Structure formats: C-alpha cells, structure tokens
Amino acid sequence: MFLNALKAVFGTKNDREVKKYFKRVAQINALEGNYQNLSDDELKAEFAKFKEQILSGEKNENDVLNDVFAIVRETGKRTLNMRHFDVQLIGGMVLHDGKIAEMKTGEGKTLVATLPVVLNAMSGKGVHVVTVNDYLAKRDAEQMSAIYNFLGFSVGVVLSSQNSDIEHKQAYDCDITYGTNNEFGFDYLRDNMKFSKAEKVQREHNFVIVDEVDSILIDEARTPLIISGPTNRTLDGYIKANEVAKQMQKGEAVLPPAKPEGDFVVDEKNRNILITEAGIAKAEKLFGVENLYSLDNAILAHQLDQALKAHNLFEKDVHYVLRNNEVIIVDEFTGRLSEGRRFSEGLHQALEAKENVKIQEESQTLADITFQNYFRMYNKLAGMTGTAQTEATEFSQIYSLDVISIPTNIPIKRQDKDDLIYKTQNEKFKAVIEEIKKANAKGQPVLVGTASIERSEVFHNMLVKEKIPHHVLNAKNHEQEALIIQDAGKKGAVTIATNMAGRGVDIKIDDEIRALGGLYIIGTERHESRRIDNQLRGRAGRQGDPGISRFYLSLEDNLLRIFGGDRIKSIMDRLGIEEGESIESRIVTRAVENAQKKVESLHFESRKHLLEYDDVANEQRKTIYRYRNELLDENYDIRAKISQNIAEYSANVMNDYMLDESGSNVNFENLKAKILYECSTQISEKDFENLSVIEMQDKLSQILENSYNEKMLRLEIKELRNIERILYLQVLDNAWREHLYQMDILKTGIGLRGYNQKDPLVEYKKESYNLFLELVNRIKFDSIKLLFSVQFNQEEAQNLENKANEENEKLLQSSVEMGASEDNLGEAEFKKVPRNAPCPCGSGKKFKECHGKSGPKQGILA
C-alpha cells in the first residue's frame, strides 16, 4: 500500500526514465526545422560531417545523437513518407543505450530500429539486426534500406536459403546486416571451423539489436545451436527400451517416507520421470541384465529413461507431429514446425521408436553455443518486443539488460476482460463456440488462440459442425501464415491460431470493424508464461484501435491442474457452480496469474541453472577459439609453438620412463621404442650417459628438433609453415570434438553426485577443468606425433589446405541444421565391439579409448 502511494506521487522507475528521454526528444524536435529546409545533397553532406567526426574520434555517438536522430527522421519523411513519432525517438534512444524497448504491437519497431542502427553504423564496425525468421529479415531490410542507402550505408541480409559463404560474407561486410538468430549463431560456429581467416564470413561482434527479444533470449535460451556429426553407436537399444517402457506401469506420486506404487512416477512440474525400485527390478528382468545402473549399462538406462519420457511427457500433435514418416518438433512457444531440429540426448530416437518410424542415428556435437552466450559476446546488445516486463528480472540478471516500457503513440482502447473459468474442458469448448457465434452473427472478426495443434483441430471440427466459415493457422499449414493473419481483421472472419499467431504481421481493421468493437481475441487456455498470453492479447487494439480480449479456462487445463486448480476448485464448490456455469472474478484471475508466476519462476531457475553449466563450457570454448584464431594469423610463430611442444613432450616422455627420481635409472628399451613409434626417430642410450634429469630432457628435445628439421628440409619454408598450421588445426579440432563428447557424458551423470551430498555444479566445474587440462596436453602431444609421422611430397603439401577445406565443408553440409542430418561414417567391423573390449585395430587399448571414441575424425587423422 505504501509503495503504491509512493508510485502515485513520484511515479515508477520506468516513468522517471521515460521522463528523462522526453527531455532529449524536445532537443531533437527543436532541430527538425533546420534539416527539413536542406536539399537532399545538403542533408547528406551534414550527415557525412558527423560521420567523419565519429571516425576521427573527435566526437562519440552520444555527442551527435540529437543531430543524427533528427537527420534520420527527416530521411524517413523523404524516402518512405514516414516520420518518427516522439515515442519512437525514445525507443531509438533506449536501444542505443543497450536496453530493451518494450513497445506494443503496431507501434513501428521496424522504423524505430533505423535510429540506433544508423547512429552505431557510423563507426564502420558494423551493426547486426536479428529477427525471428527469414521473411521478417528480408522484409525489414528491404523496407528500411531506402533510409540507409540515402545516408550512404550498405545493407545485407543473411538468409538460410543462401548456400554459399560468399553471399554470407558479402552480407556481413555491409555496414548493416539483417538476419535470423539461427543464421548469425551458425555462421559464428562455422567460422570457428575454417582453416584460414579469409574464409571467415563474420566481422567483429560490435552492436546487435534483437527484434522479438523475448522469443530469442528467453524462449529459445534452452535450445543450443549445435553443429553435429555422426557417431558409431548402435540404435538397437532404443527399440528394446521402447518395448520395456510399454510394459512398465505408471504410479502416483506420494510424499516421503511413503513409497510410490507402480514402476515409475511422472513429475509433470519438472517434466521428468522417476523409476521406482520395483520398476528397476522389472526393467532388469526384461532387459536381461543384473544391474541396470552399472557402468556397462549406463547407455541402456539412459535409453529407458528417454523412452518413458517419450511415452508419458510427449504427445503427438502437441509436442511433435508425424510428417512423411518423420518426427518433427513443434516449437512450444510459436507453434511452428521446427524443421531440421531434433531433440537431443536420444529423446528424438525414443520418439521415433515410439511412433514406429525409421530411427535416425544419434549425433555427436562438433560445435555448439547457446543464444545466451552468443549474444553476450557483442560489445553492445539491445532488444525490442511488445512483451518484456514480465521477464525483466531475467533480462537483468542474465544479460544485464534493463527493460523500458515506451508509452504508446495513441492510448490503448482494448478491453481486457476477466477470465471465465469452467469446471470441465467440454463446458469451456461449448462456451467458446457460443461466443464465436454471437460475434460472428454481427460480423465482428474473432481470433481464437489455442495452445496446441490438437486443440486448434478440436475447435475446427466444432466450427465445421456449426457451419461457421473459418481459417485454421497452425504448424501444419504455416505456409499461408501471413495471408491468413492479414485477413483476420476483416468482417465476419474467424481465425483459429496456435501461439504462432503471426508475430511481425499486423492485423489491420477498417472503420466498419471499429464500429463493431474491433477484433475480438478469445484465448482458450492460459499459457505457462503470462508473456505469451499478452502477445495474443496484443493482436487487437493496435495504434489506438478498439478491441476485446478474454480467456476461457477450465479446471482440466494443464496449468490449473498442475499448478493451482485446487484453490479455484474450492471457490467454485463453495459458490455452488453448476455444470455449464462459469466463474468470473478478479480473485480467480489473480490465482491463475500466480500459477503462471510459479511456472515462470521454475523456468527461470532452469534457464539460470543451465547457463551456470554452459558458462563453464563457454569459457573453455572462448579459450580454444581464441587460440584457433591465433593459429589462423599468418604472423603467428607456429614454429616456436612446435619447439615448445617438443620440449614439453620430451620432458613428459622422459619422466614416464624414469625408474627413480635421480634419473640414474631409465627404462631406455621402452623409451627408444616409444620415440621410434611416435616420432619415427632413433635414439641411442649413449647420448644420455652421465646427464641429469633436466639435461636428459633437453637432450631428447634437441634430438627431436634436429630430426624434425631434417624431415621437413625438402619443403619450402612457406609451404612448411602452412602444413604445420593446417595439421595443428586438425589436431585441435578433433581434440575439441572429443572433449565436447566427454563433457556431454560428464553433464549427463553429474546430477547423481547430489545423492552423495556434493554440489553437482561444483563437481562439474572441477571435473571439466581436469578434462580441459587433458585436452590442452592432448593437443600439444598429438600435434607432435602427427607432425613426425606424416609423409608429404611437394604436390600433396600444396593441396593440403584445399583438401582440409573440402573435408570440412562435407562435414558441415551434413550437419549444420541443429543436429539434423547425421550420416554414419563408422567402419562396419567396429560396430559390434563392446566398449570395454580390446580394440580390433591392435593398439592394445580398450575399444572406448581407441576407435570407439565418439565423433568423426577429420583430415589426416581420419
């Protein structure tokens, strides 16, 4: 109460921030008359003057902001016949300050972006504008290019349909580059698999504006971008696990110390499966194993867990669809089909086994990054969306981004009515149909929002029975999305849409529809996130238009059933609500919002937890990529690095074969054999007589240096350095891929450390650090072994880089789409070998430590 009184007197923090921006808007408005009297050439000359001041360092962007914004506004009037409103100037300043501008639907975010884009492009370092799909990227770039071109800037677009690096490089070399989050992220990963700097397509990560920032940085935060390759693992386990899962009985969750009945319990809140002791015993019997959770059966246990999830947590036409005998993911936030994406950790294979379609092979991660860590690389990050305040805490804690709500140019007239809640879904469905009939009878357009494809088709069938013409927009027919959404505001239109409801495409209405009350939004279920509900509401009432929104709920809806239905049910029972009757109350609406807050909090903690783990891998990724970039630099002294590695290798090998610390007793027979095998070099025991430990290490290093120099004498220095660089890169890349595989295994099992009263995150940091130290040593020593073992003639040496690039390109082409396409490159004779058995190659190592290592080898290591 006291806080509300303070806000009434002093305003909210947001109000105070907006007030500051309005002061600067007045200064920009004062300049408008100066620039509108100039000719085109004079206006361009004025802008060029400010640009030169930025490039010379005489002034910075903040110094020239008022003039540049005034010039961009004038340019918009001349080229597009569009003048930036005062609130749009505020939006532009918010973006320039590296914050999130929350602007309602129809407020012109596309035009707003031109202000900070132009201001930040003046430094020549490039500006990226990110949208959620190719259509919007292309549309926005084409529409706004008139402003950019007038002021002398080049504009590029990065599209998924572009096949060549040349097109992408041309787009990134432009002053301003539009594209999707996926393409920007994948290009970054692909760049860090290239063998020369000239082949890289991206420039530095200077300034980025993310459109629909909540969708990209919140909804997709848990979906990493993955470039994947094939593994040699068998798929039979998924078929067995699917059969076992079908025979296991679901039990009900109980509070400890009581033990649940049945073979497993479904934890819907955390979307997890808990197998009971009885379930473990049954699974062991059905699989024919003694201990399901022994090390040898770890993969089988994991496959069973995924099979149970596939049967109990994932529904067809809700979480995925079947198309052409393939399991296609339905994005839970947009309702779109996610072509080319696959669930990770074997879940997709479990769903394929469940649906009895061809099981595609598992993939091995070759390179990955989350959107969280990709966008945090930029020197300055900003975003725009119509719905951000509900996630302001997460934006602040994860991305250090403040959210500023920008006032609308014209006040919102939409009526947001309280929810109507029914006891059962059937009652709710009937009530929705009746409401549609009423609105349709007078010609008022209706947009019906559903949470899944399944629900949209339920309403479709009911409307067909009522003979009400309508359109259905869901993942199965998303190709017509823009056309359907554009017509949704016409007289008599009834449109059923999943959450995808055309973000970025405005629903416009005419005066006749305004007189009928505007577009009527009917939500048939509350989403887990208030933000998604607000997006649906925001389809109506754009730019001061009238409109209505209302949600119809039932106690059988997932959100209420899992997170808060008991309280509402007790209220309905006390009020004696009969079948077919509903309850409408602010208390009930608040109870629903509290349930949503619980879910949002759970998801936030989940994303935060994942980021804590990913930050560990991210630091390692940055270290490896930084070193990889050094290797690509022609001025990098690769020869000095090789000499250093030879010295470390020599010290390491010598220590391995010393029988005492004094160095007087060395196993020279085994040492000679190892050096001959790994470095193709003969050594004599006499060379090491009467030497100290340090002297022996130095002597071995000197012998290997001389041997290496003699071996490479026949090659020209330039060719030699190029060979060394390419081979070193291949060793680094293969070692990094193997490291990612080991990190995946570590992450999968680390949660079990909690049962031993240890913090899994602390354990993960410790173990991953040890793995990283092993990785560094593997790169050093494997590069030495490889450089000593290769044999080249002049022609092979000259073609090495081309061959490496060709192999890399093949690997990328088979696996760029978020782990989509996976080809088995494994040798047939290795497929059936148990992981702990001796490797058939004769190395003497266990298969899992030799040819059983996951992931494709590349280049000369293949």
Curated annotation (Swiss-Prot):
Q: Which residues bind Zn(2+)?
A: C839, C841, C850, H851
Q: Which Gene3D superfamilies match?
A: Helical scaffold and wing domains of SecA, P-loop containing nucleotide triphosphate hydrolases, SecA, preprotein cross-linking domain
Give a Gene Ontology cellular component term annotated to this protein.
cell envelope Sec protein transport complex
Q: Which cofactors, if any, are listed as required?
A: Zn(2+)
| Alphabetized Pfam families for the sequence | P-loop_SecA (PF21090), SEC-C (PF02810), SecA_DEAD (PF07517), SecA_PP_bind (PF01043), SecA_SW (PF07516)
Membrane topology value? Peripheral membrane protein
Task: Return the EC number.
Answer: 7.4.2.8
Cell compartments where the protein resides: Cell inner membrane; Cytoplasm
User: Which keywords does UniProt give here?
Assistant: ATP-binding, Cell inner membrane, Cell membrane, Cytoplasm, Membrane, Metal-binding, Nucleotide-binding, Protein transport, Translocase, Translocation, Transport, Zinc
Primary location: membrane
Q: Which reaction does it catalyse?
A: ATP + H2O + cellular proteinSide 1 = ADP + phosphate + cellular proteinSide 2
GO terms in the biological process aspect are: intracellular protein transmembrane transport; protein import; protein targeting; protein transport by the Sec complex
GO MF term (any one): metal ion binding
Function, in words: Part of the Sec protein translocase complex. Interacts with the SecYEG preprotein conducting channel. Has a central role in coupling the hydrolysis of ATP to the transfer of proteins into and across the cell membrane, serving as an ATP-driven molecular motor driving the stepwise translocation of polypeptide chains across the membrane.
User: What is annotated about its quaternary structure and interactions?
Assistant: Monomer and homodimer. Part of the essential Sec protein translocation apparatus which comprises SecA, SecYEG and auxiliary proteins SecDF-YajC and YidC.
Task: Indicate the family of this protein.
Answer: Belongs to the SecA family.
Give the protein's recorded name: Protein translocase subunit SecA
- Which organism does this record belong to? Campylobacter jejuni subsp. jejuni serotype O:2 (strain ATCC 700819 / NCTC 11168)
The gene that this protein is the product of is secA
